[in-house]
Each structure stands twice: as structure tokens, then as C-alpha cells.
């Protein structure tokens, strides 16, 4: 009788183990392929339930009617709503003491007599700033206001679309503050929170799925508006991934925004495909006559323009 060899049967066991490992690896690979195919594959039809398509494209004033009154001011919003516009697009930022104020630029230099960044100022300091004199030396009292002031003032007379501006991916509290105010005033029907940052919109939906969100995007890595209006040190390039349509497609599937806000210079084929798939699309800042006509001809959900009165006239022709 021979001495048992410890190696006897080890090779078959190793073979069985390696076979399981190969099958497990293949299954993981297949799962990864399926996930990537879902995320980066064809655009699904829009299935949102919080947005009702209007009978004609909506017309929003960019920067709160900023070409006709002080930028992002309540004074401008009142003028826009009085003119019969469907809504306004404004910008929200957090102050140093975590108040959400409506202000376009990252710094206050261009629009006020003060200097410095919004994030470095308290709410009291921001609300003391007058937007009037830089727009018109004769205009006084068009002060900066909070998001809460805007929500309370609009009261459903139009739609208030607020771009939440954040410095990065880290949680800043801006989403929670915005959602708290929407809930306090039961403003779900007339407030939309928008952002270039999909993480911001994801957080908003985690806080309250009934708050309507809009994902903003463009194809270029620079914003002509920012270049023209804001100090060069404030201009932040749009990250490469957010300029790639295959990545944006995956973002739309994960974040599930209720609307899209698309720059009018985005690849026309992308814009046409999204509209054909049923996405409620805002086209932002077509300002020249021809650009407005092209945008409205696509029958989008709406346009956001610095020339909203002309856009309104063209739409109603």
C-alpha cells in the first residue's frame, strides 16, 4: 500500500476552482458590458411625469430680463412678468453664511460698486448691494435679494428657473436650502432648479423627487457670456466629460432630469434627436433674429433669451 500523495486530486480541484473563476469573471464582464451598453447606448424616450408640454414654446428672460433691467434683480423679474413672459432664468449662489442669494457672476465687481466673491460675503453684505447704478446711474434701490424673496414674489405668476452655481462636487448645502424654500412655499409648480453639475441635480432629487430639475449643457469648453462679462479669473472651463454626448447620455439615464437646457450652439443632430425622443428642451440664449427663428422652428419646450420680447413676437406670429 503506497503512501498517499498530497498532490493527488489537487489538480482537479484547482481546475474546478479556476473554471469557476473564469465563469465568474466572464459573468462580471458580461454584466459590465450590459451596464455600459445601457448607459452609453441609444437615447431612451423621455418618461418624465412632472412636466406638461405647453401648446407653444415658452419664452423665458435670461438673467431675469438682464438686458432690460439690472441683472438678476427682482426689479427685472417684475418687468419680465409684467411684459407677459412665461418665466425667468436667474442664478443662485450660497453666501459665506449659507444663505441662497440670486446673483449671476461669481464676483460682485461687474454688477455692483463693491468687490469680491459672493462666496466670501455674508447674506447681509450681499443684500446691501444695489444693482441699479451700474445698469443706470439714475436707478437706485434694485438690491440683491434672496432666493426666498424671489419665490415669495413670483407666487406662480410665471416660472422661476434657478441655476444653482457650486464650486465643485463637494456638498455645499445649496441643494438643501433651495429645496427647503420650495417646500415651505409649496412652489413645486412654478420653480425649476437647474445646473451644469449633474451631482447637484441628483442631490436635489434625493431630497425631494417632486422638485423639477433641468440639466444644462453645451459643447464648447468656454462660455462666451462668461468670457464677455466676468473677470478672466472667474471663468471656469466646462469639464471635458460634460461636453461629450455619450457621457451626457449616461448622466441623463442616471440623474433623470425633468428638463434639458441646451445651448443654442450645441450639435444640431443632438438637439433634434432629444426633441424627437420627447425630451422637454429649453434652448438657451438664441438672441439674434436668425438664431431665434431657428430655435423656435424646432418646437422646443421653450427658449431662454436675452431678447425675450422679440422671441415672444416671433413665436406668436
What are these regions (language model features)?
Residues 2-317:
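Phosphate-group recognition and catalysis centered on beta-loop-alpha active-site segments
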Amino acid at each position: 500500500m503506497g503512501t498517499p500523495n498530497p498532490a493527488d486530486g489537487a489538480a482537479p480541484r484547482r481546475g474546478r476552482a479556476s473554471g469557476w473563476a473564469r465563469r465568474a469573471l466572464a459573468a462580471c464582464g458580461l454584466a459590465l458590458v450590459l451596464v455600459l451598453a445601457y448607459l452609453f447606448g441609444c437615447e431612451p424616450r423621455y418618461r418624465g411625469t412632472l412636466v406638461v408640454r405647453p401648446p407653444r414654446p415658452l419664452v423665458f428672460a435670461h438673467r431675469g430680463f438682464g438686458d432690460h433691467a439690472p441683472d438678476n434683480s427682482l426689479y427685472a423679474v417684475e418687468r419680465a412678468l409684467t411684459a407677459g413672459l412665461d418665466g425667468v432664468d436667474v442664478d443662485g449662489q450660497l453666501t459665506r453664511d449659507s444663505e441662497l442669494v440670486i446673483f449671476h457672476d461669481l464676483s460682485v465687481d461687474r454688477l455692483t460698486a463693491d468687490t469680491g466673491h459672493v462666496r466670501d460675503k455674508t447674506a447681509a453684505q450681499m443684500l446691501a448691494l444695489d444693482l441699479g447704478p451700474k445698469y443706470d446711474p439714475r436707478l437706485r434701490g434694485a438690491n440683491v435679494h434672496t432666493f426666498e424673496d424671489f419665490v415669495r414674489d413670483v407666487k406662480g405668476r410665471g416660472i422661476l428657473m434657478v441655476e444653482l452655481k457650486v464650486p465643485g462636487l463637494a456638498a455645499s448645502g445649496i441643494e438643501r436650502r433651495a429645496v427647503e424654500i420650495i417646500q415651505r412655499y409649496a412652489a413645486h409648480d412654478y420653480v425649476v432648479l437647474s445646473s451644469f453639475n449633474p451631482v447637484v441635480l441628483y442631490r436635489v432629487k434625493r431630497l425631494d423627487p417632486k422638485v423639477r430639475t433641468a440639466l444644462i449643457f453645451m459643447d464648447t469648453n468656454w462660455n462666451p457670456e462668461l468670457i464677455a462679462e466676468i473677470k478672466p479669473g472667474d471663468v471656469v472651463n466646462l469639464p471635458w466629460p460634460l461636453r461629450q454626448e455619450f457621457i451626457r447620455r449616461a448622466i441623463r439615464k442616471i440623474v433623470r432630469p425633468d428638463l434639458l437646457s441646451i445651448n443654442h450652439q450645441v450639435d444640431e443632430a443632438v438637439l433634434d434627436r432629444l426633441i424627437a425622443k420627447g425630451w422637454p428642451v429649453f434652448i438657451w440664449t438664441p438672441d439674434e433674429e436668425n438664431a431665434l427663428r431657428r430655435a423656435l422652428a424646432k418646437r422646443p419646450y421653450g427658449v431662454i433669451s436675452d431678447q425675450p420680447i422679440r422671441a415672444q413676437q416671433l413665436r406668436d406670429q
